[in-house]
């Protein structure tokens, strides 16, 4: 077993060796390096064929028509293209958008930008377990609501939203439904031929493909229109211009092909490892599970350890690559906005750790993790005056701290 142990698969994944090998065939002179938009020679045709195969591999994993897959530079761009693209195209119908407070920043910041441009956005607060109350969602829907954006799996706590029911609710009212599926694709079954979802964002690098490539699903029947955000050349049926990066697209396609083959066995294995980890630490005093094990992705475990300072905990766990919050916000010392939206106090939110497991995680690594976490929590609490006061029965919420 090698240290440090990587348990931050929700931030990014290593590229699968099978994917890397495939990508190498599309870079150099003796490979398929052509521009897929070059229609006048073989180099271009071969590149175009490689892109078509990858588009099919992605469509097959999610039950879509390959013509509904638009390549982008990643899920952040897909979220921007979906939300801005749909809002701008349908703004004559209305200017109201609904999302949730626990979405990824790529959705929240895009909505904030649209607010600056005159749109109105309702941000729903989830229930304590992170799940959106569908009655609240229904109550928020208005005649001028044009778009709902609610993710499939939350990147910090792993809870799974009921996108099938939300899709039905939106379709019944003629509202466009966008889903950020970055954390769920290849981990949970997605069948867009059955789901009433109009727009869905995907990434390559969360599922053992390369960074810098993603896709947006844009439904054809009923046809959804979006306004392009990137112009020049009219690639991707006019929705996203720019030369297609064949090696990255092929890598993403191969990663999705592998995911389709291995998803069922892999997810059962990861669920077992995640449960093993939780069962190994849940009897520590003042430990709280964030999210919902039953309605949660199989690979994410988010836990708060009360009376332990989050940053010092991460330092104590230096043999583990884990995070508190998402990678996009982990540089700030602000507590996770997702946990605060669940109604958690700052102290508890600060002491939260996200363990996210993946393809190369082993049982041995999980057992080492359990042991290290138990020792570290014990040691840090021995040093903590707050823990001592708590053990003596002092109600810490009733204390007024003096500001110097």
Swiss-Prot record:
Catalytic activity annotation: (sulfur carrier)-H + L-cysteine = (sulfur carrier)-SH + L-alanine
UniProt feature coiled coil, ranges: none
Any one GO BP annotation for this protein: [2Fe-2S] cluster assembly
Keywords: 2Fe-2S, Cytoplasm, Iron, Iron-sulfur, Metal-binding, Pyridoxal phosphate, Transferase
Pfam families in UniProt: Aminotran_5
UniProt modified residues of type N6-(pyridoxal phosphate)lysine: 206
PROSITE patterns cross-referenced by the UniProt entry: AA_TRANSFER_CLASS_5
Molecular function terms from GO: 2 iron, 2 sulfur cluster binding; cysteine desulfurase activity; metal ion binding; pyridoxal phosphate binding
InterPro entries with a match to the protein in the record: Aminotrans_V_dom, Aminotrans_V_PyrdxlP_BS, Cys_deSase_IscS, Cysteine_dSase, PyrdxlP-dep_Trfase, PyrdxlP-dep_Trfase_major, PyrdxlP-dep_Trfase_small
Compartments, record wording: Cytoplasm
SUPFAM superfamilies documented for this protein: PLP-dependent transferases
Positions of [2Fe-2S] cluster binding: 328
Recorded superkingdom: Bacteria
EC annotation from Swiss-Prot or TrEMBL: 2.8.1.7
Statement: the UniProt record of this protein carries the keyword Cytoplasm: yes
Annotated family: Belongs to the class-V pyridoxal-phosphate-dependent aminotransferase family. NifS/IscS subfamily.
Subunit structure comment from the entry: Homodimer. Forms a heterotetramer with IscU, interacts with other sulfur acceptors.
Protein task: Master enzyme that delivers sulfur to a number of partners involved in Fe-S cluster assembly, tRNA modification or cofactor biosynthesis. Catalyzes the removal of elemental sulfur and selenium atoms from cysteine and selenocysteine to produce alanine. Functions as a sulfur delivery protein for Fe-S cluster synthesis onto IscU, an Fe-S scaffold assembly protein, as well as other S acceptor proteins. Also functions as a selenium delivery protein in the pathway for the biosynthesis of selenophosphate.
PANTHER family: CYSTEINE DESULFURASE, CYSTEINE DESULFURYLASE FAMILY MEMBER
Identification of the protein by name: Cysteine desulfurase IscS
Species the sequence originates in: Salmonella typhimurium (strain LT2 / SGSC1412 / ATCC 700720)
